[in-house]
UniProtKB/Swiss-Prot annotation:
Location of the UBC core domain: 251-415
GO biological process: embryo implantation; fertilization; mating behavior; prolactin secretion; protein polyubiquitination; reproductive system development; suckling behavior
Keyword Signal: no
Low complexity bias: start-end ranges: 1-15
Residues the record marks as active site: C351
PTM remark: Autoubiquitinated in vitro in the presence of NEDD4L.
Name of the featured protein: Ubiquitin-conjugating enzyme E2 Q1
N-acetylmethionine: modified positions: M1
Start-end of Basic and acidic residues biased regions: 212-221
The protein's assembly and partners: Monomer and homodimer. Only the homodimer is linked to ubiquitin through thiolester activation. Interacts (via N-terminus) with B4GALT1 (via N-terminal cytoplasmic domain). The interaction is direct.
EC number: 2.3.2.23
Composition-biased stretches (Gly residues): 16-35
Parts forming coiled coils: none
Length: 422
């Protein structure tokens, strides 16, 4: 969304911009304009990445290089607030989706730290503009970036009535003095090496800066084909971010990536009990094939017959996730084949307390949900309806059935059958 330009500054794009001294990004440095950002800035960026990593619960560095920084302030998860709700008197930024973080961007000129960073926020909320306006009070120092971010995080916590995060105090730790003074005044030999260093750091993605051991353990046990899928997802996310077409939330995306990694490592997945495919490469839309059910069940026999008739011996489920996952359950429905029994409702919705807000827990893993659904279908004596009209299963009908299901059970509670009934 476009904003009126702050006086004395140019507006580079959406959101509000403040915090610099009127210099356009990239201006004021280079020949005749100062030496450009030195090693001190690099160490500031690395310190920020080590403190506010992509898994941080309050503030995250999304990406960083020598001339630009992108970060996110998370509103949910503190002070007993539910997902998607910002506790306290101030509401989330106008025009934002509940649960979305406050996205903040910073342009760093070549004359930093002589010229302070220039900040902007993806919102037209005047309260957020006021937070950035107060940065003009901080004008001097070799670590202006750290000082600015400490003020921003502290003021945002106050604005949303959130407790001050203890990690903010870590921004006060000094950088090695000899590396911020002697190296900033480089010799001619060091100046000749700077372009190579700068080129590397201009493409520095904070999320990818991981210890070799950490990355090895993260990918350990995942097949090459599935690693390629994960890498494609991350590449698409970076491209969407650059195009300004980010979907979902950081919170949900991080959790879904973890769930997918865990599934790819799982013995049940590797053993062929089920398969997972992303619909149109979307992390928020999964097709799950139940490939194996209890071999002693009538459902298993039906699937064997289905294979002979139609060439498919699996039950296809669809999982759709919202931005506030994992605090809300996924919406799960049967896509095919048409089933009777098994707690499957009209349209393909599934009657399970586990899949409602009342019965859901953010601690549940997606694999455990998949296996529970498989067991529930068998216990509910699900059978394939051969010759049934396949069009009776649709997303719209499933959502309608699910809504009615929730309303009924909110009034009457859930019935737990005796153990002898399965």
């Amino acid at each position: 969304m476009q904003q009126p330009q702050p006086q004395g500054q140019q507006q580079p794009g959406p959101g509000q911009q403040l915090g610099g001294q009127g210099a356009a990004p990239g201006a004021g440095g280079g020949p005749g304009g100062g030496p450009g950002p030195g090693p001190c800035l690099r160490r500031e960026l690395k310190l920020l990445e080590s403190i506010f990593h992509r898994g941080h619960e309050r503030f995250r560095i999304a990406s960083a290089c020598l001339d630009e920084l992108s970060c996110e302030f998370l509103l949910a998860g503190a002070g007993g607030a539910g997902a998607g709700a910002a506790p306290g008197p101030h509401l989330p930024p106008r025009g934002s989706v509940p649960g979305d973080p406050v996205r903040i961007h910073c342009n760093i000129t070549e004359s930093y730290p002589a010229v302070p960073p220039i900040w902007s926020v993806e919102s037209d909320d005047p309260n957020l503009a006021a937070v950035l306006e107060r940065l003009v009070d901080i004008k001097k120092g070799n670590t202006l970036l750290l000082q600015h971010l400490k003020r921003i995080i502290s003021d945002l916590c106050k604005l949303y009535n959130l407790p001050q995060h203890p990690d903010v105090e870590m921004l006060d730790q000094p950088l090695p003095a000899e590396q911020c003074t002697q190296e900033d005044v480089s010799s001619e030999d060091e100046d000749e090496e700077m372009p190579e260093d700068t080129e590397d750091l201009d493409h520095y993605e904070m999320k990818e800066e991981e210890p070799a051991e950490g990355k090895k353990s993260e990918d350990d046990g995942i097949g090459k084909e599935n690693l390629a899928i994960l890498e494609k997802i991350k590449k698409n996310q970076r491209q969407d971010y650059l195009n300004g077409a980010v979907s979902g939330s950081v919170q949900a995306t991080d959790r879904l990536m973890k769930e997918l990694r865990d599934i790819y490592r799982s013995q049940s997945f590797k053993g062929g009990n089920y398969a997972v495919e992303l619909v149109n490469d979307s992390l928020y839309d999964w097709n799950v094939k139940l490939l194996k059910v209890d071999q002693d069940s009538a459902l298993h026999n039906d699937l064997q017959i289905l294979k002979e008739k139609e060439g498919a011996d699996f039950i296809l489920l669809n999982f759709s996730f919202k931005d506030n996952f994992p605090f809300d359950p996924p919406f799960v429905r049967v896509v095919s084949p048409v089933l009777s029994g098994g707690y499957v409702l009209g349209g393909g919705a599934i009657c399970m307390e586990l899949l409602t807000k009342q019965g859901w827990s953010s601690a549940y893993s997606i694999e455990s949900v998949i296996m529970q659904i498989s067991a529930t279908l068998v216990k509910g004596k699900a059978r394939v309806q051969f010759g049934a009209n396949k069009s009776q299963y649709s997303l719209t009908r499933a959502q309608q059935s699910y809504k009615s299901l929730v309303q009924i059970h909110e009034k009457n509670g859930w019935y737990t059958p005796p153990k002898e009934d399965g």
